[in-house]
Structure formats: structure tokens, C-alpha cells
Amino acid sequence: MRKIVIHSPRAEVRALIRGLLSDIEAYFVPAATRSELVRICSTTKCDLVITDDVRMFLNGSDTVAQIRKGEPLPQIFVLSHDLSEEAVTALLELGVNQFISLPMAPERLRAKVASHYRELV
């Protein structure tokens, strides 16, 4: 079964993302901290990571490599209000697969996730 890790320091954001994706057939794993996210990704097979924490990628800790230690290599979607060219470019250069600007239409996130899974087939 597909596994999606939803990471956010805020429980209400994790719940909101989970609710928006309720029609996607997948096992959802919540992660509240960066260390929890890295642990989950290194100990279980996950297809997709969705996070709203831009800082963890930009702090020099090589979070993308830590998330992608195992197989399969999960796609990483980042949700953020920061639309600066520097932030978006840095995230993409670090290996983030999708940058989704907030606020967003719920359909947009569902479409991005559905598209990701169609590509896997």
C-alpha cells in the first residue's frame, strides 16, 4: 500500500492535509518533528513526504539526503507561503520535487498527489 508521511510541527496542519487527501488510497503517517520524519523515512518504505517546514531544508542539515536513505526514494512536496525566488530555487536545487504555494486550492494538492501516483504505475 502507498505510504504518505505528513510532516508539520502543527497538529492542525497535519490533520488538514490528511483530510484533504482522504480520497487517496494510502496509509498516512504523521510526523511532528524533523527527527521523527527522518526516523520514519529511514525505517519504513514511504512513497511521498508532504511538509510545510521549509526551514529544515535550508538550515544546512542535508535533510533531503536523510529522508532518502532508504528505498524507494520518496518524493518530497513542500507547502509554503514563502514565494521568494531564492527560497523556491534553493528547495528545488536541494532535491525537493514539488513546491506548492500557500494558500492553495485543496484540489491542487490532491491533483499533485494523484499525478505522482499515476507516474509510479
Regions found by a protein language model. Give the residues of each.
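Two-component/phosphorelay signaling modules centered on CheY-like receiver
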Residues: 10-29
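Acidic, metal-coordinating helix/loop segments flanking the phosphotransfer/catalytic sites
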Residues: 32-48
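Conserved phosphotransfer cores of two-component systems
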Residues: 42-44, 66-73, 94
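Conserved phosphotransfer microenvironments
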Residues: 47-67
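Alpha4 helix (beta4-alpha4-beta5 surface) of REC/receiver domains from two-component response regulators
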Residues: 62, 82-98
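A short, hydrophobic beta-strand element within the central beta-sheet of small alpha/beta folds
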Residues: 73-83
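C-terminal output helix
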Residues: 104-113
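The C-terminal output helix
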Residues: 114-121
